Structures are given as C-alpha cells and as structure tokens.
C-alpha cells in the first residue's frame, strides 16, 4: 500500500518493510473480525491507515522525547482492538505494552491478534482501568499511559495518572479543539499528582484530520484514595 509506505516514511519508522507487513496483517485481522462484531466504524483500508495507523503512530516522537528508559513499559487504557498500543508496539518494538480493556470480546481479539502476529512484549489485561490503578502490580508501574479520546480528560486522568510512575507521562489523544476539556481537568491533574507538560496540535499526514496530544507528566505519587470507583469518577469528576 503506497499510502502506508508514505506514512511510515513520514514517521521515520525503522525497518519499514517488516513493520509494513505486520501492520497490514493486523489491519486485515481487524477488518475481518469487524464483520462479526463491532471493533471499528472504519471499513475502508485507506481510511484505516490514516485514522488508526497514522493516528496511533503520532505518539512515537513523544515517546522518544519523553523516554529515559531503554525498554519503557506502557499501558493503553480503553484499547478496544489494540489502538494505539499494538500499533506503537509494532513500530517501536522496544516498548513493552499492556493493552487494557474491560470488554471480554475485545480482549479475546487482542490476544488472538498478538499471537497471530507473533509479537512478544505484549500483555492483554481484561479489567476496568480504575481497578488496575488500585492493584499493587499495576499502580505506579508504567512509564507511559495512552488513551485515545475514550472519555473526558478529567475522567481519563483519574484512570491514567495512578498507573504512572513518578516521572512518567500520560499521552492523551484528543481532537483539535481540546482547551475546554483541559481547563476542566486542571484540578484533577493537580490532585492526582500531575502537571500539564505540553499540548501538541497537528494534522495527520496525507489527510486533513486534525488532532491534539496532551502530555501530562507525573510529578509526585497519587494519593492512596484515588482512583475512586467508576460511578464516582463519572458522576463527580475531580
């Protein structure tokens, strides 16, 4: 696929032939399974390349910029069929990725996909993110947390920040107009031990799709009473 070649060149992905082969295989797995149950609203390959692959790979330069660990550990919350986490793993194999979703069908698919692709350093965790944030084996264990526009930022922060190590970064992928969400999330970010580090706005390559990535750094440990349960997080956001 010429468009995919261009996207991989744009993001300066290493070993592009190997990465391209795996990405196409993964895309085909998603589109085939999508006929049986809903994984994505996107059915066109070129649209998939832009809205899923290019969108996910937009994280790469920020991972490189913020990473002080040779083999960083990242968790993708609300991963769905594995976006952006599995795309990041394919393009940047040094990252150890946990794919988190509470939907059992989607988790089953992600496990099948990683086995089919023959990729190591990928773990699928089928659980609610706020439950993981209270478990010792997950709390404050990650260099990066990814989330793709799955909820409001003030809600996402209570799921994401407890999972980060001090010094780690939450990379929240949002639409272009995100200022109101950021304003509403400032209190939550402060309470949970974080700080807005930067807001990156850009257009996805070979498209007119506008995006933002909000980078939130963790400066101190999250208080032990967070995260709260889902009902409290959603109904009474910080």
Swiss-Prot record:
Gene Ontology annotations for the cellular component aspect, listed alphabetically: cytosol
Keywords: Cytoplasm, Methyltransferase, rRNA processing, S-adenosyl-L-methionine, Transferase
Localization of this protein: Cytoplasm
Main location: cytoplasm
InterPro entries assigned: rRNA_ssu_MeTfrase_G, SAM-dependent_MTases_sf
Signal sequence extent: none
Keyword Nucleotide-binding carried by entry: no
GO molecular function term, any single one: rRNA (guanine-N7-)-methyltransferase activity
Pfam families named in the record: GidB (PF02527)
Protein EC: 2.1.1.-
Gene3D superfamilies listed in its UniProt record: Vaccinia Virus protein VP39 (3.40.50.150)
Cysteine-cysteine disulfides: none
Binding site for S-adenosyl-L-methionine: 78, 129-130, 148
SUPFAM superfamilies xrefs: S-adenosyl-L-methionine-dependent methyltransferases (SSF53335)
Keyword rRNA processing listed: yes
Job description of the protein: Specifically methylates the N7 position of a guanine in 16S rRNA.
Family note: Belongs to the methyltransferase superfamily. RNA methyltransferase RsmG family.
Classification via PANTHER family: S-ADENOSYL-L-METHIONINE-DEPENDENT METHYLTRANSFERASES SUPERFAMILY PROTEIN (PTHR31760:SF0)
Protein's UniProt name: Ribosomal RNA small subunit methyltransferase G
Name of the gene this protein is made from: rsmG
């Amino acid at each position: 696929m010429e468009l995919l070649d261009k996207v991989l060149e744009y993001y300066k992905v290493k070993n592009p032939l190997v990465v391209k082969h795996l990405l196409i295989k993964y895309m085909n797995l998603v589109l085939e399974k999508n006929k049986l149950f809903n994984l994505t609203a996107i059915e066109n390959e070129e649209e998939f390349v832009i809205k899923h692959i290019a969108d996910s790979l937009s994280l790469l330069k920020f991972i490189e910029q913020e990473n002080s660990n040779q083999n960083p550990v990242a968790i993708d919350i609300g991963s769905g069929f594995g976006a952006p986490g599995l795309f990041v793993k394919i393009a940047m194999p040094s990252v150890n990725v946990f794919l988190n979703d509470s939907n059992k069908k989607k988790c089953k698919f992600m496990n099948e996909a990683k086995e089919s692709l023959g990729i190591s350093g990928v773990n699928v965790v089928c659980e609610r993110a706020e439950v993981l944030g209270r478990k010792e084996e997950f709390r404050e264990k990650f260099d990066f947390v990814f989330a793709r526009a799955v909820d409001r930022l003030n809600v996402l922060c209570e799921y994401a920040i407890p999972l980060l190590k001090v010094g780690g970064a939450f990379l929240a992928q949002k639409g272009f107009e995100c200022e109101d969400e950021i304003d509403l999330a400032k209190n939550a970010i402060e309470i949970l031990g974080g700080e807005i580090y930067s807001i990156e706005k850009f257009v996805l390559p070979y498209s007119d799709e506008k995006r933002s990535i909000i980078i939130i750094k963790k400066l101190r440990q999250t208080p032990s009473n967070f995260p709260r349960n889902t009902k409290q997080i959603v109904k009474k956001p910080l």
